[in-house]
């Protein structure tokens, strides 16, 4: 199982402490010691599962815009967005704690702007979280025009990781961060993108195609 680069330190630290407690369990009175060893082993497996980064086959079709996250589409609507303009399409992907947590670039381009916004920690399936919760807003200049997407913290997930920098050139499918313990990713596509995704669709980050430049 490949581990996300954003979790290497946490996995190493967890593995060391779990190893110590696992061995300690054999020297404690039983069955309490065995229960301790089993508990720390399960915790280690959960940590590995949480930080997993499975291989993904990135679509190579010209003009494809891919999902930036694993999850389920819970909202799709036409909006007038200050970055992408009137007639844009908002697609919201809800990430459960059991989904892969890493996030990927939806389409190649250049990072125009990063905007961290502190906020609340409403449940991610509450659509107010888009405007009220802590989030990282990202603007890309692409062949489709300017697109905007956002990592949103949730009630459980309170740690956003984003390693992008303004001016950075990025490629479709590249890792750029993660939202620990899930939450949601919102993406706003300009009118130049024909969005084929629909509410209820399950997405695989880096693989599922949300729409096409036309």
UniProtKB/Swiss-Prot annotation:
One example of a Gene Ontology biological process annotation: phosphatidylethanolamine biosynthetic process
Protein origin, superkingdom: Bacteria
Record site: Cleavage (non-hydrolytic): 182-183
Catalytic activity annotation: a 1,2-diacyl-sn-glycero-3-phospho-L-serine + H(+) = a 1,2-diacyl-sn-glycero-3-phosphoethanolamine + CO2
Catalytic residue positions: 183
Listed EC numbers: 4.1.1.65
One term under GO cellular component: plasma membrane
Enzyme class at the top of the EC tree: lyase
Disulphides: none
Residues bearing PTM Pyruvic acid (Ser): 183
Keywords carried by this UniProt record: Cell membrane, Decarboxylase, Lipid biosynthesis, Lipid metabolism, Lyase, Membrane, Phospholipid biosynthesis, Phospholipid metabolism, Pyruvate, Zymogen
Compartment(s): Cell membrane
Entry similarity comment: Belongs to the phosphatidylserine decarboxylase family. PSD-A subfamily.
Job of this protein: Catalyzes the formation of phosphatidylethanolamine (PtdEtn) from phosphatidylserine (PtdSer).
Subunit structure as annotated in this protein's UniProt entry: Heterodimer of a large membrane-associated beta subunit and a small pyruvoyl-containing alpha subunit.
Name of this protein: Phosphatidylserine decarboxylase proenzyme
Lineage, uppermost ranks: Bacteria, Pseudomonadati, Chlorobiota, Chlorobiia, Chlorobiales
